[in-house]
UniProtKB/Swiss-Prot annotation:
General function of this protein: This protein is one of the early assembly proteins of the 50S ribosomal subunit, although it is not seen to bind rRNA by itself. It is important during the early stages of 50S assembly.
Keywords: Ribonucleoprotein, Ribosomal protein
GO molecular function: mRNA binding; structural constituent of ribosome
Name of protein: Large ribosomal subunit protein uL13
Record text on subunit structure and interactions: Part of the 50S ribosomal subunit.
GO biological process: negative regulation of translation; translation
Alphabetized CDD domains for the sequence: Ribosomal_L13
Organism: Mycoplasmopsis agalactiae (strain NCTC 10123 / CIP 59.7 / PG2) (Mycoplasma agalactiae)
Database matches in PANTHER family: LARGE RIBOSOMAL SUBUNIT PROTEIN UL13M, RIBOSOMAL PROTEIN L13
Family statement: Belongs to the universal ribosomal protein uL13 family.
GO cellular component: cytosolic large ribosomal subunit
Length: 144
């Protein structure tokens, strides 16, 4: 008789991966990375435990949008005060903080729970090709 193995976070074999975002479409990149962060690429996926791997995204400022989304896409946030709805286009956001577009896309694809917050901490987005996580010996990961 087969037994179902339940893997908890202590038994999770977490790896480090580095993903190059250069010339990658933001949405496709975000969907793939969110899947790796959640651990859905592993055969031992458990939905209620942090099973995902660590992901470093380099060249985040070189991720692309399709069509005219660079000028047309608008990001909104609210200050909490009446009339406090703020908006910024993708082009202005990229100029202000190059990593924010990729971070926001991935964060939106992760669960909005305590577990999702833990999984967000496993993501490291870097503008440029150099990162400070070489000591972890990350493996290269291609976006499917």
């Amino acid at each position: 008789m087969r037994q179902t193995t339940i893997v908890n976070r202590e038994k999770a074999n977490k790896k480090w991966f580095v993903v190059d975002a250069e010339n990658q479409v933001v949405g496709r990149l975000a969907a793939f990375v969110a899947s790796v962060l959640r651990g859905k690429t592993k055969p031992t996926f458990t939905p209620n435990a942090d099973m995902g791997d660590y992901v470093i995204i380099i060249n985040a400022e070189k991720a692309i949008f399709t069509a005219k989304k660079e000028e047309d896409k608008v990001y909104y946030h609210h200050s909490g005060y009446p009339g406090g709805l703020k908006s910024i286009t993708a082009a202005k956001l990229r100029a202000k903080k190059p990593t924010a577009i990729v971070e926001k896309a991935i964060y939106g694809m992760l669960p909005h729970t305590k577990l999702g917050n833990k999984q967000r901490r496993n993501l490291f987005v870097v503008a440029g090709s150099e990162h400070k996580y070489a000591a972890q010996k990350p493996e290269r990961l291609e976006v499917r």
